[in-house]
């Protein structure tokens, strides 16, 4: 009897846990919706209904997400964490959310994202990272996101974006990139090429407006011609690996080349995207070609006119001298014929 009573009590407690709604939250069981927004929460509430599909946690004071922070809601599809104080996302913070489709992390204090942070979100369709302080995104944030269609990273501190990260999102159709600190140098050429192909295929983007260097500040990256890019310099050889032993050096002494303290600065300057220098005499060359063509045309016309004039003059002269000559020749022929006829047979 006591065993049955204990079992019954356990079932009651379990049902209360499953069906309960956390304090300061509003739960709607018919739609599996839980709203815990604007409650001054500092951490994720415990005892969330496991059948929750939509969870709103925006406008709180959550600073940190531990690993497996949402293990109690494995069926979650929409998660809104916007306008909190998140600065640290532990690896595996979203582990177990196999069905998550929408993740909103806008208006937080994120500085960077750990590689493969979202690797457990295969169904993710929308990721909003806008209005943070992110200065760098890794080349990968997880497995290939076959279903991701919207990525927003506007209003951050990004200077570069690796093309490999975008190539891991073959289905993306909307890309929001504005209001960052884009440095339009040679390292952004790969991104430019990817964006041109993306737009050509019908993708939508708000563009990349260059913040530096001053030559291109305020310009749209997609409107800068390819010809204006300088190739990125090759990485400087490692002085340690490039050590060489000169022939004839005594006792195997290794001579190191002198260090160039300005190499890094020079590489940075060479890498700046700057206009391709145009030859100083290019306009003069074009003008020379045009003038030469005009002169040659005039000379050809003059030669043609001279040829026509010469032929006409020759024809008129021949006709003029041909008439009298014919008349003077005829009497000779007659006289010769008479002498021939009068000769003895």
From Swiss-Prot:
Cytoplasmic-facing ranges: 310-345
PANTHER family reported in the protein's UniProt record: ANTIGEN BSP, PUTATIVE-RELATED (PTHR24369), CHAOPTIN-RELATED (PTHR24369:SF210)
Topology of the protein relative to the lipid bilayer: Single-pass type I membrane protein
Transmembrane segments: 289-309
Domain LRRCT residues, every copy: 180-234
Residues bearing attached sugar chains per UniProt: 104, 147
Residue span of region Disordered: 326-345
Name assigned to this protein: Leucine-rich repeat and transmembrane domain-containing protein 1
All residue ranges annotated as the LRRNT domain in the record: 28-50
Organism: Homo sapiens
InterPro entries tied to this protein: Cys-rich_flank_reg_C, Leu-rich_rpt, Leu-rich_rpt_typical-subtyp, LRR_dom_sf, LRR_TM_domain-containing
Subcellular location: Membrane
Ranges of the Extracellular topological domain: 28-288
Region forming the signal peptide: 1-27
Domain of life: Eukaryota
The entry's keywords: Glycoprotein, Leucine-rich repeat, Membrane, Repeat, Signal, Transmembrane, Transmembrane helix
GO cellular component: membrane
Segments of skewed composition (Basic and acidic residues): 332-345
The LRR repeat ranges on this chain: 51-72, 75-96, 99-120, 123-144, 147-168
